[in-house]
C-alpha cells in the first residue's frame, strides 16, 4: 500500500533468499537504467548493457532474463534496451498501479474481442468473420478495392507476414523489404492435467532455471485445480522439441515444486512459431506515406514505435491508424 516508488523499493528489500548486497546492486542498476532512459544515448542490446555494468550472473539469470523474455519475447543478446526502458517507464516506474500484475479469469476473446465486435455492431458495422481477403487495389477515384468491393479506406490490421501480401503490387521495395526482413520468436504454452489438485505457491510462479519460465495455477483463476499451464517465451531459443518432449520437461519443472505428482493424465502443447516480432535495437517501422496516399493504413503490435509486440502496442497502433485515416479525410 506504499506510494510509488517506495512500493518497489520495499518489495526488493523484502525479497527472500537474496543477499542484501545483491538487492542494493539491483537497485543501483535500476537507477542507472532510469538515467539511461532519460537521456538520448544510442540504443543497444540489453546483454551488452548488462556486460558494461558487470551485472552479477545471478541477477541476470533470476531478474533480467525473465524480465526481458516476458516483456520483449527476445533473447538478451538481441533485445532493445531502449524498448525495455519504455516498458518500465510507462509501467512499473510510472505509478503504483503500473506494477500490479493482472491475470484474467476469462479468455481474452471474451474480455477484448467480443465486446469490441458488439460495440461495432451497435454502430451498424458489417462484421464478416472467416473471410479471406485478396491483394488490395486502388480505383482511379482513390477508393480501395477489397474482394471486388470498393471502400473509402482500409486499415490493414493483420499479422505482418499476411499484410505484405495484401499491399498493392506496386508497393515500394523499401516497405516490402522491411516486412520481409522482420524476425520472429515463438511462444510455447504447455497444459498439464493431473489426477489430483496441484497447489502452486502462487497464481503465477516463476522458474529461473527450468524449461518453463512461468507456471500458472489455473485453480486460482476459477479453473480446475488439477490443471497447470506453463509459458515458455522465446521457445525457439530454448530448444526445438516435440510436443511430448515439451510436456515431459514442464512436468519435471512442476515436480520440482510438487514432487508428489505422478505423470499427467492429459497434456496439450501449443507453439506459436511467429508469436511476436523480435524487439531489436534501433528497429523502427517504415515510412508509410506511400500507402497512406492510397488510403491504406497498416496497424499492428509490430508497428509501435515505443513498445514490443504486446496488446497495448496493438491497441495503440490501431488507434493511431484510425486517427490518421480520419485526419486524412478531414473528419478530425
Features from the language model and the residues they span:
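Mobile amphipathic helical/loop "lid" adjacent to a hydrophobic cofactor/ligand pocket
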Residues: 1-86
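Surface-exposed helix-capping loop/turn segments at secondary-structure junctions
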Residues: 39, 57, 122-127, 139, ...
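Amphipathic alpha-helical segments that form well-ordered structural scaffolds
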Residues: 49, 111, 115-119, 249-253
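Short, surface-exposed acidic
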Residues: 54-64, 176-179, 259-267
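Helical element adjacent to the flavin cofactor pocket in flavoenzyme catalytic cores
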Residues: 87-144, 153
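Mid-domain catalytic core of redox enzymes
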Residues: 131-244, 248, 252-257, 286
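Conserved flavin/dinucleotide-binding core of flavoenzymes
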Residues: 214-332
Amino acid at each position: 500500500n506504499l506510494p510509488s516508488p517506495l512500493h518497489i523499493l520495499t518489495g526488493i528489500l523484502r525479497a527472500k533468499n537474496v543477499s542484501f548486497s545483491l538487492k542494493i546492486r539491483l537497485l543501483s542498476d535500476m537507477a542507472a537504467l532510469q538515467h539511461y532512459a532519460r537521456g538520448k544515448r544510442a540504443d543497444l542490446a540489453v546483454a551488452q548493457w548488462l556486460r558494461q555494468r558487470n551485472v552479477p550472473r545471478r541477477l541476470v539469470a533470476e531478474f533480467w532474463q525473465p524480465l526481458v523474455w516476458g516483456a520483449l519475447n527476445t533473447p538478451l543478446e538481441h533485445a532493445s534496451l531502449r524498448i525495455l526502458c519504455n516498458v518500465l517507464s510507462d509501467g512499473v516506474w510510472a505509478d503504483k498501479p503500473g506494477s500490479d500484475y493482472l491475470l484474467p479469469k476469462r479468455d481474452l476473446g471474451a474480455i477484448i474481442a467480443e465486446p469490441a465486435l458488439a460495440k461495432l455492431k451497435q454502430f451498424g458495422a458489417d462484421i464478416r468473420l472467416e473471410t479471406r481477403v485478396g491483394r488490395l487495389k486502388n480505383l482511379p477515384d482513390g477508393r480501395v478495392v477489397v474482394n471486388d468491393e470498393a471502400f473509402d479506406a482500409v486499415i490493414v490490421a493483420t499479422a505482418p507476414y499476411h499484410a505484405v501480401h495484401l499491399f498493392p503490387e506496386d508497393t515500394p521495395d523499401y516497405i516490402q523489404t522491411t516486412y520481409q526482413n522482420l524476425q520472429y520468436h515463438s511462444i510455447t504454452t504447455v497444459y498439464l492435467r493431473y489426477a489430483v489438485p496441484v497447489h502452486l505457491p502462487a497464481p503465477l510462479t516463476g522458474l529461473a532455471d527450468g524449461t518453463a519460465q512461468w507456471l500458472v495455477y489455473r485453480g486460482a483463476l476459477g479453473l480446475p485445480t488439477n490443471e497447470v499451464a506453463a509459458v515458455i517465451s522465446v521457445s525457439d531459443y530454448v530448444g526445438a522439441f516435440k510436443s511430448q518432449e515439451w510436456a515431459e520437461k514442464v512436468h519435471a519443472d512442476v515436480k520440482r515444486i510438487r514432487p508428489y505428482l505422478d505423470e499427467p493424465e492429459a497434456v496439450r502443447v501449443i507453439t506459436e512459431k511467429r508469436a511476436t516480432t523480435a524487439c531489436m535495437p534501433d528497429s523502427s517501422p517504415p515510412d508509410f506515406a506511400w500507402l497512406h496516399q492510397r488510403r491504406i493504413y497498416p496497424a499492428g503490435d509490430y508497428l509501435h514505435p515505443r513498445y514490443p509486440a504486446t496488446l497495448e502496442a496493438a491497441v495503440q497502433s490501431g488507434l493511431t491508424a484510425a486517427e490518421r485515416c480520419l485526419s486524412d479525410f478531414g473528419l478530425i
